[in-house]
Amino acid sequence: MVNLLQIVRDHWVHVLVPMGFVIGCYLDKKSDEQLTAFRNKSMLFKRELQPNEEVTWK
């Protein structure tokens, strides 16, 4: 039991840092989805595009 506790005490960083990265990527993706939904309703981007005109957001 002491060995398991020692391993957890020594290597907690190796678990929390990747978990933080994964959670950050997930939250970033959700934020992008919300901003995309707003962009499609925005008055700025509501106009029709000219022929051969690219979208202004990427």
Swiss-Prot record:
Bilayer topology term: Single-pass membrane protein
Keyword Membrane part of the UniProt annotation: yes
Spans traversing the lipid bilayer: 11-27
Recorded GO CC terms: mitochondrial inner membrane; respiratory chain complex I
Predominant location category: mitochondrion
InterPro entries: NDUB1
Localization (cell): Mitochondrion inner membrane
Keywords per UniProt: Electron transport, Membrane, Mitochondrion, Mitochondrion inner membrane, Respiratory chain, Transmembrane, Transmembrane helix, Transport
Domain of life: Eukaryota
First and last residue of the signal peptide: none
Matching Pfam families: NADH_oxidored (PF08040)
Disulphide linkage map: none
PANTHER family per the UniProt record, alphabetical: NADH DEHYDROGENASE [UBIQUINONE] 1 BETA SUBCOMPLEX SUBUNIT 1
Subunit structure, as described in the record: Complex I is composed of 45 different subunits.
Biological role stated in the UniProt entry: Accessory subunit of the mitochondrial membrane respiratory chain NADH dehydrogenase (Complex I) that is believed not to be involved in catalysis. Complex I functions in the transfer of electrons from NADH to the respiratory chain. The immediate electron acceptor for the enzyme is believed to be ubiquinone.
Similarity-based family: Belongs to the complex I NDUFB1 subunit family.
Protein name: NADH dehydrogenase [ubiquinone] 1 beta subcomplex subunit 1
Species per Swiss-Prot/TrEMBL record: Pongo pygmaeus
Biological classification of the source: Eukaryota, Metazoa, Chordata, Craniata, Vertebrata
